[in-house]
Regions:
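Short S/T/G/P-rich N-terminal loop/turn motif that feeds into the first structured element of a domain
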Residues: 1-22, 48-56, 70-135, 147-149, ...
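C-terminal functional regions that serve as terminal interaction/effector modules
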Residues: 1-2, 155-191
Length: 191
């Protein structure tokens, strides 16, 4: 891709943009250029239909630019109401809210011990966890569920215009009791 002539890049970018704009799915694009050694960008697909996502990706792969794409990571998850939340809210990408400047995406796996705890004990810890998040209104959390359809329990996507606020949030969350039950929360993909 980097070796293509500028005009060819421009034309292939238009081709790709047309597919994304006309896709039967929502697509958000983010740059990871210089932030990761395994990818230059992230594509976030949202749809009621896995088949629509697959069809869109297939069309992308058939473009001039798409022939150069090699996925470094693929994650699958779905939206559903939280069993711990006092009130459930719609995710920013579902409501059509404009994306923030940054998104930090990562897979999340809790320990087996977490799921063996009584529900009320887990709920108390999750309430503390939620209250910590409420101190950072400038950071929007999108939690989606991967149980049974991918390798992790959840996919988290934090959106913010301020990476320092996100970092402060994560540092505070590490001090919550629930953090003792985190098995995996990497890789962190900053876009």
């Amino acid at each position: 891709w980097r070796w293509m002539a500028d005009l060819a890049k421009e034309e292939s970018a238009k081709e790709l943009e047309s597919i994304i704009q006309n896709a039967p799915v929502k697509v958000r694009t983010y740059s990871t250029l210089g932030l990761r050694d395994d990818a230059d960008f992230l594509l976030w697909f949202m749809s009621e239909s896995i088949e629509d996502i697959q069809e869109t990706i297939s069309k992308i792969y058939h473009t001039v630019a798409g022939k150069y794409f090699i996925p470094s990571r693929v994650y699958l998850s779905s939206t559903r109401p939280s069993i711990y939340a006092r009130k459930n809210r719609l995710h920013s990408f579902v409501t059509g809210m404009d994306p923030k400047k940054y998104v930090v995406v990562y897979p999340f796996i809790k320990t087996r011990e977490w799921y063996l705890l009584p529900f009320e004990q887990r709920k108390i810890m999750m309430d503390e966890h939620s209250k910590t998040g409420e101190k950072f209104p400038q950071v929007e959390l999108n939690t989606t569920y991967s149980f049974g359809i991918h390798d992790e329990d959840f996919m988290l996507a934090f959106e913010s215009d301020d990476l320092h606020a996100f970092q402060d949030l994560i540092m505070d969350l590490r001090q919550n009791k629930v953090s003792a039950y985190v098995a995996v929360d990497t890789p962190m993909i900053v876009c």
